[in-house]
Amino acid sequence: MQSKEDFIEMRVPASAEYVSLIRLTLSGVFSRAGATYDDIEDAKIAVSEAVTNAVKHAYKENNNVGIINIYFEILEDKIKIVISDKGDSFDYETTKSKIGPYDKDENIDFLREGGLGLFLIESLMDEVTVYKEPGVTISMTKYIKKEQVRNNGERVEIS
């Protein structure tokens, strides 16, 4: 059996107004690949966090709006998403060390600011790799479970 592979590329201005367009595209890509509703929602949150981080941090020192590149690679059993910018970089390991673990009994008013987006991305995606310089590139992979609907309307996952 021949393996199926598709590749989709987007370039958008690093502006918050484009986050919804990226989420909509992601929904279409994941739906077309047969992903479950839960996998689609998890990926939308993770990608929104990564794009929002790029919008807020990558080009803050530059008065011009930069560009964010988004790539979707659809494989037989997974979807790889790569989000990159050419803006300011950050030290991923240092930022990661300052987040979590969060205690379920911890008062939300006292949670540390920053880094929560990275925590969400790593929690919701199956594989996450961050490359820096030039800019920041976040590569995320979601292994997809297929979903079917039975005659009675019940959704079931298939392998």
UniProtKB/Swiss-Prot annotation:
UniProt keyword Transmembrane present: no
Keywords: ATP-binding, Kinase, Nucleotide-binding, Serine/threonine-protein kinase, Transferase
Gene Ontology molecular functions: ATP binding; protein serine kinase activity; protein serine/threonine kinase activity; sigma factor antagonist activity
Catalysed transformations (reactions): L-seryl-[protein] + ATP = O-phospho-L-seryl-[protein] + ADP + H(+); L-threonyl-[protein] + ATP = O-phospho-L-threonyl-[protein] + ADP + H(+)
CDD domains, per database record: HATPase_RsbW-like
EC number of this enzyme: 2.7.11.1
Signal peptide: none
Annotated family: Belongs to the anti-sigma-factor family.
Function: Negative regulator of sigma-B activity. Phosphorylates and inactivates its specific antagonist protein, RsbV. Upon phosphorylation of RsbV, RsbW is released and binds to sigma-B, thereby blocking its ability to form an RNA polymerase holoenzyme (E-sigma-B).
Name of the protein in its database record: Serine-protein kinase RsbW
Organism: Staphylococcus aureus
Classification of source organism: Bacteria, Bacillati, Bacillota, Bacilli, Bacillales
Protein encoded by which gene: rsbW
